[in-house]
Amino acid sequence: MNILIFGPNGSGKGTQGALVKKKYDLAHIESGAIFRQHIGGGTELGKKAKEYIDRGDLVPDDITIPMVLETLKGAGPNGWLLDGFPRNMVQAQKLWDALQAEGLKLDYVIEILLPREVAKNRIMGRRLCKNDNNHPNNIFIDAIKPDGDVCRVCGGSLSARADDQDEGAIGKRHDIYYNTEDGTLAAAYFYKDLAAKGVTKYIELDGEGSIDSIKDTLLKQLA
């Protein structure tokens, strides 16, 4: 089973991706990790990518796409879940063409829907427990709202990450994601159009639901 997943920062995309990975024993492939793997491993593609990164430039698609494709091809027998790529319409088309050329099927495309303001509030509402950062606490999500200023799981003190409170940085990330002309949503809609032609399946999920309700809906549609 091969899957692409889309969702804005704050939508729970990483959480749902991890649940799907565990359920179907998929390789969970994150675009940033691909760069780190190639650069750290000193591959030819990694060396080329590093030159651009060191100059502060975007790595061109003719380097990025082969990196992604190589990782997908080596993902293992159960398939993969790709997170964080593509990020625009051009990349979506190039990735699709590359998958077709390699005979790799794209079974599902998942989009987690969440209003921009809700996504921003969720990011700014995240709180970290001093005892365990994996303890879920968010002042804007009722199911995991902390008890005052202490962790809802263990009672430890809470803090907020500085970048989670930077509205400007959050806005820039969301500007890219919610752009339906040449941003990440444009990439998602490219696959939505393909699904309308019957060449893949497109799943839309209401990101305002609980983690469990979203998971249950998703797994039913993947079954």
Curated annotation (Swiss-Prot):
Transmembrane segments: none annotated. It comes from the Bacteria. GO terms for biological process: AMP salvage. Its EC number is 2.7.4.3. Pathway: Purine metabolism; AMP biosynthesis via salvage pathway; AMP from ADP: step 1/1. Its main location: cytoplasm. Gene3D superfamilies: P-loop containing nucleotide triphosphate hydrolases. AMP binds at residues 31, 36, 57-59, 84-87, 91, 161, 173. Residues 30-59 are annotated as: NMP. Pfam families: ADK. Residues 125-164 are annotated as: LID. It catalyses: AMP + ATP = 2 ADP. ATP binds at residues 10-15, 126, 209. The keyword Cytoplasm applies. One of its GO terms (cellular component) is cytoplasm. Keywords: ATP-binding, Cytoplasm, Kinase, Nucleotide biosynthesis, Nucleotide-binding, Transferase. Belongs to the adenylate kinase family. HAMAP family: Adenylate_kinase_Adk (MF_00235). Monomer. This is Adenylate kinase. It comes from Nitratidesulfovibrio vulgaris (strain DSM 19637 / Miyazaki F) (Desulfovibrio vulgaris). The lineage of its organism: Bacteria, Pseudomonadati, Thermodesulfobacteriota, Desulfovibrionia, Desulfovibrionales.
